[in-house]
Amino acid sequence: MTNGHINPANVPDIALKDGHSIPQVGLGVLRIDDEGVVPVVESALEAGYRHIDGAAGYNNEAGVGRALAASGYNKGAKRETLWVTTKLRDSQQGYDSALKAFDNSLELLQLDYVDMYMIHWPTPFDWRSTDTWKAFVKLRDEGMARTLGVCNFMPADLKRLHEETGAWPAVNQIELHPTWQQREVVAFCKEHGIAVEAYSPMARGADINAGDGTIEKIAAAHEVSPAQVILRWHIENGTIIIPKSVHADRQKENLDLFGFALTADEHAAIDALDGPTRAGHDPLTFTYA
Protein backbone atom coordinates (compact mmCIF):
# COMPACT_ATOMS: atom_id res chain seq x y z
CA MET A 1 0.00 0.00 0.00
CA THR A 2 1.82 3.09 -1.23
CA ASN A 3 0.56 6.27 -2.80
CA GLY A 4 3.81 7.53 -4.27
CA HIS A 5 4.55 11.00 -2.93
CA ILE A 6 3.10 11.37 0.55
CA ASN A 7 1.63 14.70 1.55
CA PRO A 8 3.48 15.71 4.74
CA ALA A 9 0.18 17.13 5.99
CA ASN A 10 -1.06 13.54 6.32
CA VAL A 11 1.46 12.89 9.09
CA PRO A 12 0.12 14.23 12.38
CA ASP A 13 2.17 16.25 14.80
CA ILE A 14 2.54 15.27 18.44
CA ALA A 15 2.27 18.27 20.76
CA LEU A 16 5.08 18.41 23.30
CA LYS A 17 5.00 19.85 26.80
CA ASP A 18 7.40 22.63 25.82
CA GLY A 19 5.00 24.03 23.23
CA HIS A 20 6.67 22.55 20.16
CA SER A 21 5.19 19.85 17.92
CA ILE A 22 7.05 16.93 16.36
CA PRO A 23 5.98 14.97 13.26
CA GLN A 24 4.85 11.56 14.50
CA VAL A 25 6.79 9.68 11.80
CA GLY A 26 10.46 10.27 11.14
CA LEU A 27 13.41 8.59 9.47
CA GLY A 28 16.04 6.92 11.65
CA VAL A 29 19.60 6.80 10.27
CA LEU A 30 21.36 4.35 12.59
CA ARG A 31 23.93 2.05 10.95
CA ILE A 32 24.19 3.95 7.68
CA ASP A 33 27.67 5.17 6.83
CA ASP A 34 28.47 8.81 6.18
CA GLU A 35 28.48 8.48 2.39
CA GLY A 36 25.51 6.15 2.21
CA VAL A 37 23.27 8.33 4.36
CA VAL A 38 23.23 11.16 1.81
CA PRO A 39 20.93 9.53 -0.78
CA VAL A 40 18.89 7.93 2.01
CA VAL A 41 18.01 11.29 3.56
CA GLU A 42 17.48 12.87 0.14
CA SER A 43 15.01 10.17 -0.90
CA ALA A 44 13.18 10.44 2.43
CA LEU A 45 12.76 14.18 2.02
CA GLU A 46 11.51 13.62 -1.52
CA ALA A 47 9.01 11.06 -0.21
CA GLY A 48 7.59 13.57 2.23
CA TYR A 49 9.45 12.96 5.49
CA ARG A 50 9.78 16.08 7.61
CA HIS A 51 11.54 14.49 10.59
CA ILE A 52 15.10 13.13 10.59
CA ASP A 53 16.47 11.40 13.70
CA GLY A 54 20.24 11.17 13.99
CA ALA A 55 23.03 11.08 16.55
CA ALA A 56 26.68 11.95 16.91
CA GLY A 57 27.31 8.31 17.74
CA TYR A 58 26.03 7.20 14.35
CA ASN A 59 29.09 8.84 12.76
CA ASN A 60 27.08 10.19 9.85
CA GLU A 61 26.09 13.72 10.87
CA ALA A 62 28.24 15.18 8.09
CA GLY A 63 26.41 13.07 5.52
CA VAL A 64 23.04 14.11 6.91
CA GLY A 65 24.20 17.70 6.70
CA ARG A 66 25.22 17.32 3.07
CA ALA A 67 21.83 15.84 2.23
CA LEU A 68 19.97 18.65 3.98
CA ALA A 69 22.05 21.27 2.20
CA ALA A 70 21.66 19.62 -1.20
CA SER A 71 17.89 19.43 -0.71
CA GLY A 72 17.64 23.01 0.53
CA TYR A 73 16.40 22.01 3.98
CA ASN A 74 19.30 23.47 5.95
CA LYS A 75 18.08 27.08 5.96
CA GLY A 76 15.23 29.39 5.10
CA ALA A 77 11.55 28.55 4.82
CA LYS A 78 12.16 24.88 4.03
CA ARG A 79 14.25 24.50 7.18
CA GLU A 80 11.29 25.64 9.28
CA THR A 81 9.20 22.75 7.90
CA LEU A 82 11.72 20.11 9.01
CA TRP A 83 12.39 18.53 12.41
CA VAL A 84 16.00 17.46 12.96
CA THR A 85 17.09 15.54 16.05
CA THR A 86 20.62 14.69 17.07
CA LYS A 87 22.06 13.12 20.21
CA LEU A 88 25.08 13.62 22.43
CA ARG A 89 27.72 10.90 22.65
CA ASP A 90 27.85 9.34 26.10
CA SER A 91 31.59 10.01 26.32
CA GLN A 92 30.88 13.73 25.89
CA GLN A 93 28.39 14.09 28.72
CA GLY A 94 29.15 16.88 31.17
CA TYR A 95 28.61 20.64 31.00
CA ASP A 96 31.56 21.95 28.99
CA SER A 97 32.00 18.81 26.93
CA ALA A 98 28.32 18.78 25.93
CA LEU A 99 28.46 22.37 24.74
CA LYS A 100 31.58 21.65 22.69
CA ALA A 101 30.05 18.49 21.24
CA PHE A 102 26.89 20.35 20.27
CA ASP A 103 28.87 22.96 18.36
CA ASN A 104 30.58 20.19 16.43
CA SER A 105 27.28 18.48 15.61
CA LEU A 106 25.75 21.74 14.42
CA GLU A 107 28.72 22.37 12.13
CA LEU A 108 28.55 18.87 10.66
CA LEU A 109 24.80 19.15 10.11
CA GLN A 110 25.25 22.58 8.45
CA LEU A 111 22.41 23.96 10.58
CA ASP A 112 21.85 27.06 12.70
CA TYR A 113 19.86 25.09 15.28
CA VAL A 114 18.47 21.63 15.91
CA ASP A 115 14.87 20.92 16.77
CA MET A 116 15.78 18.42 19.47
CA TYR A 117 18.98 17.55 21.32
CA MET A 118 18.98 14.35 23.35
CA ILE A 119 21.07 12.54 25.93
CA HIS A 120 21.67 9.23 24.17
CA TRP A 121 22.00 6.86 27.16
CA PRO A 122 21.61 7.54 30.89
CA THR A 123 24.73 5.60 31.95
CA PRO A 124 23.51 5.34 35.57
CA PHE A 125 26.84 3.69 36.48
CA ASP A 126 28.61 6.93 35.44
CA TRP A 127 25.88 9.54 35.94
CA ARG A 128 26.65 12.88 34.34
CA SER A 129 23.19 13.70 33.05
CA THR A 130 22.61 16.46 35.60
CA ASP A 131 25.52 18.60 34.42
CA THR A 132 24.73 17.66 30.84
CA TRP A 133 21.15 18.82 31.24
CA LYS A 134 22.31 22.19 32.53
CA ALA A 135 24.29 22.59 29.30
CA PHE A 136 21.22 21.56 27.32
CA VAL A 137 19.16 24.26 29.06
CA LYS A 138 21.76 26.86 28.05
CA LEU A 139 21.49 25.69 24.44
CA ARG A 140 17.70 25.90 24.59
CA ASP A 141 17.78 29.36 26.13
CA GLU A 142 20.08 30.50 23.34
CA GLY A 143 17.75 29.08 20.67
CA MET A 144 20.27 26.52 19.51
CA ALA A 145 18.24 23.46 20.54
CA ARG A 146 14.51 24.03 20.61
CA THR A 147 13.43 20.87 22.44
CA LEU A 148 15.37 18.81 24.98
CA GLY A 149 14.98 15.07 25.25
CA VAL A 150 16.52 11.87 26.52
CA CYS A 151 16.85 8.34 25.24
CA ASN A 152 16.66 5.04 27.08
CA PHE A 153 15.82 6.64 30.44
CA MET A 154 14.01 4.35 32.84
CA PRO A 155 11.69 5.78 35.52
CA ALA A 156 14.54 5.84 38.05
CA ASP A 157 16.68 7.87 35.64
CA LEU A 158 13.86 10.29 34.91
CA LYS A 159 13.18 10.73 38.62
CA ARG A 160 16.85 11.41 39.32
CA LEU A 161 17.08 13.96 36.54
CA HIS A 162 13.98 15.70 37.85
CA GLU A 163 15.18 15.66 41.44
CA GLU A 164 18.54 17.18 40.49
CA THR A 165 17.40 19.68 37.83
CA GLY A 166 13.69 20.27 38.48
CA ALA A 167 12.95 19.34 34.87
CA TRP A 168 11.28 16.57 32.94
CA PRO A 169 12.43 16.04 29.34
CA ALA A 170 9.92 16.68 26.57
CA VAL A 171 10.61 13.32 24.91
CA ASN A 172 11.98 9.93 25.97
CA GLN A 173 13.13 7.79 23.05
CA ILE A 174 13.13 4.10 23.99
CA GLU A 175 13.18 0.69 22.39
CA LEU A 176 9.50 -0.07 21.88
CA HIS A 177 7.75 -2.62 19.70
CA PRO A 178 5.00 -5.26 20.02
CA THR A 179 7.22 -7.80 21.78
CA TRP A 180 8.90 -5.22 24.06
CA GLN A 181 6.22 -2.72 25.04
CA GLN A 182 7.83 -1.29 28.20
CA ARG A 183 4.42 -0.46 29.64
CA GLU A 184 5.79 0.73 32.99
CA VAL A 185 8.11 3.21 31.28
CA VAL A 186 5.38 4.41 28.92
CA ALA A 187 2.92 4.89 31.80
CA PHE A 188 5.49 6.86 33.80
CA CYS A 189 6.21 9.10 30.82
CA LYS A 190 2.53 9.77 30.21
CA GLU A 191 2.03 10.57 33.89
CA HIS A 192 4.67 13.28 33.65
CA GLY A 193 3.79 14.66 30.22
CA ILE A 194 6.78 13.12 28.47
CA ALA A 195 6.16 12.08 24.86
CA VAL A 196 7.31 8.56 24.00
CA GLU A 197 9.35 7.95 20.86
CA ALA A 198 10.05 4.41 19.65
CA TYR A 199 13.26 3.28 18.06
CA SER A 200 13.39 -0.23 16.61
CA PRO A 201 9.59 0.04 16.24
CA MET A 202 9.52 -3.35 14.50
CA ALA A 203 12.36 -4.96 16.49
CA ARG A 204 14.52 -4.64 13.36
CA GLY A 205 11.91 -6.65 11.48
CA ALA A 206 11.71 -9.53 13.94
CA ASP A 207 8.22 -8.62 15.17
CA ILE A 208 6.74 -9.10 11.71
CA ASN A 209 6.68 -12.83 12.43
CA ALA A 210 5.53 -12.56 16.04
CA GLY A 211 2.49 -14.33 17.39
CA ASP A 212 2.16 -17.23 14.98
CA GLY A 213 1.19 -15.06 12.03
CA THR A 214 -0.87 -12.48 13.94
CA ILE A 215 0.67 -9.52 12.13
CA GLU A 216 0.50 -11.15 8.71
CA LYS A 217 -3.19 -12.00 9.14
CA ILE A 218 -4.04 -8.42 10.05
CA ALA A 219 -1.99 -7.15 7.11
CA ALA A 220 -3.84 -9.41 4.71
CA ALA A 221 -7.19 -8.18 6.00
CA HIS A 222 -6.25 -4.57 5.23
CA GLU A 223 -4.20 -5.28 2.09
CA VAL A 224 -1.14 -3.62 3.59
CA SER A 225 2.27 -4.90 4.61
CA PRO A 226 3.04 -6.41 8.04
CA ALA A 227 5.41 -3.49 8.65
CA GLN A 228 2.59 -1.03 8.07
CA VAL A 229 0.41 -2.89 10.57
CA ILE A 230 3.03 -2.59 13.30
CA LEU A 231 3.71 1.06 12.53
CA ARG A 232 -0.03 1.79 12.48
CA TRP A 233 -0.31 0.19 15.94
CA HIS A 234 2.32 2.65 17.19
CA ILE A 235 0.48 5.55 15.55
CA GLU A 236 -2.77 4.62 17.26
CA ASN A 237 -0.93 4.44 20.58
CA GLY A 238 0.22 8.03 20.14
CA THR A 239 3.88 7.00 19.91
CA ILE A 240 6.41 8.88 17.79
CA ILE A 241 8.20 6.45 15.45
CA ILE A 242 11.47 6.62 13.51
CA PRO A 243 11.62 3.53 11.28
CA LYS A 244 14.82 3.17 9.29
CA SER A 245 15.00 2.18 5.65
CA VAL A 246 17.62 2.83 3.00
CA HIS A 247 15.17 1.95 0.20
CA ALA A 248 12.97 4.68 -1.28
CA ASP A 249 9.99 2.40 -1.81
CA ARG A 250 10.12 1.15 1.77
CA GLN A 251 10.48 4.71 3.05
CA LYS A 252 7.25 5.60 1.27
CA GLU A 253 5.52 2.52 2.64
CA ASN A 254 6.61 3.36 6.19
CA LEU A 255 5.07 6.81 5.81
CA ASP A 256 1.83 5.58 4.26
CA LEU A 257 0.00 4.67 7.46
CA PHE A 258 -3.10 6.83 7.37
CA GLY A 259 -5.38 5.12 4.85
CA PHE A 260 -6.47 2.35 7.22
CA ALA A 261 -7.14 1.74 10.90
CA LEU A 262 -6.90 -1.31 13.11
CA THR A 263 -10.05 -2.70 14.65
CA ALA A 264 -10.22 -2.88 18.43
CA ASP A 265 -9.70 -6.64 18.27
CA GLU A 266 -6.70 -6.29 15.96
CA HIS A 267 -5.12 -3.69 18.21
CA ALA A 268 -5.70 -5.91 21.23
CA ALA A 269 -4.15 -8.87 19.43
CA ILE A 270 -0.95 -6.88 18.89
CA ASP A 271 -1.03 -5.70 22.50
CA ALA A 272 -1.11 -9.36 23.51
CA LEU A 273 2.25 -10.01 21.81
CA ASP A 274 4.13 -8.26 24.62
CA GLY A 275 6.95 -10.33 26.02
CA PRO A 276 10.57 -10.28 27.18
CA THR A 277 12.07 -9.78 23.72
CA ARG A 278 14.52 -6.89 23.81
CA ALA A 279 16.16 -6.27 20.43
CA GLY A 280 18.69 -3.73 21.67
CA HIS A 281 20.77 -2.93 24.73
CA ASP A 282 20.02 -2.69 28.44
CA PRO A 283 20.08 0.96 29.59
CA LEU A 284 21.27 -0.10 33.03
CA THR A 285 24.59 -1.31 31.66
CA PHE A 286 25.11 0.03 28.13
CA THR A 287 27.01 3.06 26.91
CA TYR A 288 27.17 4.33 23.32
CA ALA A 289 30.59 5.96 23.51
Each language-model region and where it sits:
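Acidic-and-aromatic substrate-binding clefts and catalytic sites of carbohydrate-active enzymes
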Residues: 32-35, 55-63, 91-96, 124-127, ...
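Short, well-ordered amphipathic alpha-helices
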Residues: 62-72, 102-106, 136, 158
